[in-house]
């Protein structure tokens, strides 16, 4: 197993142990019944956030993406980007980070942007990509500041076609972002990594979900990027 594969599998195990990745029967916003659910909101204490940031930082450095700073879209991305900046500094790569407010301030420092000045090549840090709205808004803010969106860094790529339970699109939200903005989307792990985890988990309680996850992948999944 390569170092990258080990990192991906370590993240899946970590997410399961933290209760962030759970198995069962869940209805997604698209109306599809999924055998797994990923809830990044459960990374809710200092120790968990610190570990997540390490996964983000190592994945970004391993990706080969050239970057100068990080951007965290409000609201989840704010914490994720700032924690990742701390982790990067600990690994010897000190970069600035910025984030946006949902509503611009008209007092104090004012404006909708907080943190380091947006400049150079900027990596957008978020949890997942669903409809791509957060990415679009981030790209617009970064370009308006005269900087260049370099990549999007996310926790989990569901590798799932857009649409709903009946109308199934040709591409995933991640593929749409890559095609529209011409920049890579780097994920710590994806659905194939989840299937690999279930293959090797050795837990009878999880064995039944391997077949369900594979069937879900066959019905709604896209090819690996």
Curated annotation (Swiss-Prot):
Pfam families: Pribosyltran. Its EC number is 2.4.2.10. InterPro entries: OPRT, Or_phspho_trans_dom, PRibTrfase_dom, PRTase-like. 5-phospho-alpha-D-ribose 1-diphosphate binds at residues 29, 75-76, 101-102, 105, 107, 126-134. It comes from the Bacteria. One of its GO terms (molecular function) is magnesium ion binding. Its cofactor is Mg(2+). Orotate binds at residues 37-38, 130, 158. Coiled coil: none annotated. It is an enzyme of class 2 (transferase). It catalyses: orotidine 5'-phosphate + diphosphate = orotate + 5-phospho-alpha-D-ribose 1-diphosphate. The keyword Transferase applies. Disulfide bonds: none annotated. GO terms for cellular component: cytoplasm. Pathway: Pyrimidine metabolism; UMP biosynthesis via de novo pathway; UMP from orotate: step 1/2. The keyword Isomerase does not apply. One of its GO terms (biological process) is pyrimidine ribonucleoside biosynthetic process. Keywords: Glycosyltransferase, Magnesium, Pyrimidine biosynthesis, Transferase. Belongs to the purine/pyrimidine phosphoribosyltransferase family. PyrE subfamily. Catalyzes the transfer of a ribosyl phosphate group from 5-phosphoribose 1-diphosphate to orotate, leading to the formation of orotidine monophosphate (OMP). This is Orotate phosphoribosyltransferase. The lineage of its organism: Bacteria, Pseudomonadati, Pseudomonadota, Betaproteobacteria, Burkholderiales. The gene is pyrE.
């Amino acid at each position: 197993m390569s170092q990258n594969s080990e990192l991906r599998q370590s993240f899946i195990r970590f997410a399961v142990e933290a209760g962030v990745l759970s198995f069962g029967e869940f209805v997604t916003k698209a109306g599809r019944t999924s055998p797994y659910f990923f809830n990044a909101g459960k990374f809710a204490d200092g120790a968990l956030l610190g570990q997540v940031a390490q996964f983000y930082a190592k994945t970004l450095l391993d990706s080969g993406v050239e970057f100068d700073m990080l951007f965290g879209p409000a609201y989840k991305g704010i914490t994720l980007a700032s924690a990742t900046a701390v982790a990067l500094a600990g690994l010897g790569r000190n970069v600035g980070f910025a984030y946006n407010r949902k509503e611009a301030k008209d007092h104090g420092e004012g404006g909708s942007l907080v943190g380091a000045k947006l400049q150079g090549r900027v990596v957008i840090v978020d949890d997942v990509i669903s409809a791509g709205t957060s990415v679009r808004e981030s790209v617009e803010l970064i370009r308006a500041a005269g900087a260049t969106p370099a990549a999007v860094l996310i926790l989990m790529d569901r590798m799932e076609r857009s649409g709903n339970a009946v109308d199934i699109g040709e591409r995933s939200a991640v593929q749409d972002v890559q095609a529209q903005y011409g920049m890579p989307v780097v994920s710590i792990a994806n659905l194939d990594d989840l299937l690999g985890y279930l293959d090797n988990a050795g837990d009878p309680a999880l064995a039944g979900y391997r077949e369900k996850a594979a069937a879900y992948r066959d019905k709604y999944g896209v090819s690996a990027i």
